[in-house]
Amino acid sequence: MTSTRGLWDLPQPVIDLAQRANGWVAERSVEARSLWAKSGDGVNFLTLPEHLRDSACAASLVFHVWLSDSIKGGLAGNLGLSVKELEKLVLWLSASHDLGKGVRKFQCQIELREDVRHLVSRVRDAGLSLDQGVDELNVDKLPHSVASGGIIRDWLEETRGF
């Protein structure tokens, strides 16, 4: 069976989030909007705020269209949350999962690729330093997922006391 769901059949919460999220991207600083997340072919790329927005919007679509009410209820119950709180958690996790792509090590990793090195130049042109500290230079690889986890952990500790 094929789906006949069209663009205009999207649940209203998905549409509302997409509209708010576009404004959120536009409100980010020049520096934040200079960070790249998906290099693509170098012409068609996504900035970090755009990628985080797209991730949240995709999660919203999955939450509202694909997950059944019984699955949402079961997950929410197991976590001690309401379904609305579960939705907020899912969207937050989706939107924050790649924050580690903003670290210097990640931003510099494509600098030697001629087709996309201009993305690194955009970061510097926005006034951000990409000079890596001793700790970063002594690490051969720093997966952005590990950096994301550290950023989220530190933020939760500083702002929420977790």
Model-identified regions with their sequence ranges:
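Metal-dependent phosphohydrolase cores
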Residues: 1-162
